[in-house]
Curated annotation (Swiss-Prot):
GO terms for biological process: symbiont entry into host cell; viral penetration into host nucleus. It comes from Influenza A virus (strain A/Chile/1/1983 H1N1). Residues 1-21 are annotated as: Disordered. GO terms for molecular function: RNA binding; structural molecule activity. This is Nucleoprotein. InterPro entries: Flu_NP (IPR002141). Keywords: Capsid protein, Helical capsid protein, Host nucleus, Host-virus interaction, Ribonucleoprotein, RNA-binding, Viral nucleoprotein, Viral penetration into host nucleus, Virion, Virus entry into host cell.
Amino acid sequence: MASQGTKRSYEQMETDGERQNATEIRASVGKMIGGIGRFYIQMCTELKLNDYEGRLIQNSLTIERMVLSAFDERRNKYLEEHPSAGKDPKKTGGPIYKRVDGKWMRXLVLYDKEEIRRIWRQANNGDDATAGLTHIMIWHSNLNDTTYQRTRALVRTGMDPRMCSLMQGSTLPRRSGAAGAAVKGVGTMVLELIRMIKRGINDRNFWRGENGRKTRIAYERMCNILKGKFQTAAQRAMMDQVRESRNPGNAEIEDLTFLARSALILRGSVAHKSCLPACVYGPAVASGYDFEKEGYSLVGIDPFKLLQTSQVYSLIRPNENPAHKSQLVWMACNSAAFEDLRVSSFIRGTKVIPRGKLSTRGVQIASNENMDTMVSSTLELRSRYWAIRTRSGGNTNQQRASAGQISIQPTFSVQRNLPFDKTTIMAAFTGNAEGRTSDMRAEIIKMMESARPEEVSFQGRGVFEFSDERAANPIVPSFDMSNEGSYFFGDNAEEYDN
């Protein structure tokens, strides 16, 4: 599974395609984006939203959540079998914000899921268009990655909270398919596997019977996905062992935790995709842009170009800084939550600051928040340069880094040294070296210890001017390496825990 995944480009994963050439890929991704845009326009008509309200990111999130909920088969089935008071399993909805007499008002809307599915299919030439749904999921996941630091989830499974740079995609639903698996970080995969093993330890029947067989297949598939993210033979060999274990238990949990730590230096390859909110695609389609004809790529200049000309608004709470809210959404749109802040700042053309220094909470507004004090403001989502999104983890390099987040996961293919604090990481490896995998562990530790600054910096293309659409003239920025580059360094970003 993973080996196929590495040979198909993201766009093919994104569109469930077989091997296609570049033009076909651009067209099928464009078709997917156009479908999301058409759906959004139709929903704005249904909800009687004016142009400004349709460009409000909070309205976009509600509409996106409605369509994801309408197509969530497993949950829909569950809701019908376990009716809960006050929840109609056949309906979906959420808060929609409108301007009334110069004030923002919140109203809850409710729609039949069947109706939403009909509108979605109609916008997608009658198809279910699962690729478009996954695309929306990845956008929500990128927004969560940028907004919340997943320390609690890490601590619960016995991992170090400073490993948050491995946690990309940790809030993606299981049903997000190959495109979703491609953007999950090493830590996310490890966390999912540990949760599974823990269930097996606590529940005797987890691996048994017909259901157990399916569970086992899922377990092995997840192991293969994770194996495919590692770039060294020793890490992959350890994954084979975890996968082949007859009865996964604490030994496997230890191995997985060890592998997650090793990924701080011997980084895994994790894909990055620029997935934008539906309220960006809608107006572009409405203005007559034909995504399918023009073609579109999630990893090239296209999302940057789209953001240069898009007007997106957001509700702002009384003590929030609109510029900070813009940074949050900019990072989410570019999938840059775990990128080095210096690289992001250079590309964006304005300083990108750490999460703990941002005066902004999440983009979504809770139902009990007071609307009287809400204002709206334009999100500044433009960039100075554009860069290609990478899926290589690069190698890391011994520089001074924060005592907080160790290391980063590159988003952009831009050459630089990757800062991290090696002593902090190596300290995590003292102690437990026994167990069946001791020789592999020794080999991995040796590779990490010998990681040398000069051989292991991240090799990338560089950034490009917007006029350079073919990426012919890379500009390689030089960065002040004395500075810290991580976004979450042990600060007090909110948790993502519903």
